[in-house]
Amino acid sequence: MKYNYSRGENKVAIIYGETFASVLKKRPVTTESIVVLANQRYYDLFSEKINYAFGEQLGLNWYICRNDVHCNDLSELESVLRFLADWPENQDVLLIGLGNEGVLQLTAFLHQVSKCSSECWLMPVSVQALRQGLLPSVTIQQAQHATMHIENHSEEILFDSTLTNKKGAAPLIDLLVFIRAGLVCDYTYLQMLYQTYPDKKRLNQTSFNGILDELLSLYEQAGEKVDQFGRVFEAAFATT
């Protein structure tokens, strides 16, 4: 499925319900170079699948980030800019961010400041990470505090459920994204969530793909308001 999502004046195509490989078959990549930024954990889990999907595509490169959700910091940005320093300025590069919220923010920020970037895709491994891709701006942090903001101009978000983290508490953390949107925007949406995921068994067995469309609509209407819900309490707990 494809959802044409508006981040203010900025548009992004969100593709979900199909695999990354099937997307590539429909529209092969033609850029000269591909750089995939990924957390170490997701590189270990999914790099073979990504490499296979691209097939004989030349110029596929990996940049590995630490697993921390706060990897979108100044030191990591400086490191990846050094990594890209040898690329010719006139060479088209497709940037792909594969992983958690930190990698997605780092990739989208790099897309705006790199001398050689031409296109940016985000591949979140959770709904929590997908939420970050929906927001109109991304940040670079220092000591876990935002120091630089820039508009999020990523062109595509590919949410492949076969590349998501489904272990442990991950499904419950993803469900909280839907609950937060329901609390802020739509009480009937909360009721639907309770009926669809009444217990842990149903949560682990039922895909989120069937309810993503409405989540995207709610974020399109009030994404920043939803994202800020509860942040005051989080900040208070973090400083006590």
Task: Kindly label every feature range from the protein language model.
Residues 112-201:
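A glycine/threonine-rich phosphate-anchoring loop and its flanking beta-alpha core
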Residues 46-48, 106-108, 132:
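Short glycine-/acidic-enriched loop or helix-start segments at secondary-structure transitions
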Residues 80, 107-111, 178, 236-240:
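Buried hydrophobic packing segments
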Residues 77-83, 100, 112-113, 128-132:
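Hydrophobic, well-ordered secondary-structure scaffolds
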Residues 88-110, 114-125:
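A short, small-residue-rich loop immediately preceding and capping a beta-strand
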Residues 66-68, 98-100, 234-237:
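Glycine-rich beta-strand-to-loop/alpha-helix junction loops that act as flexible
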Residues 200-240:
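Active-site segments that bind and position negatively charged phosphate/pyrophosphate groups
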Residues 1-93, 169:
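ATP/NTP phosphate-donor binding region
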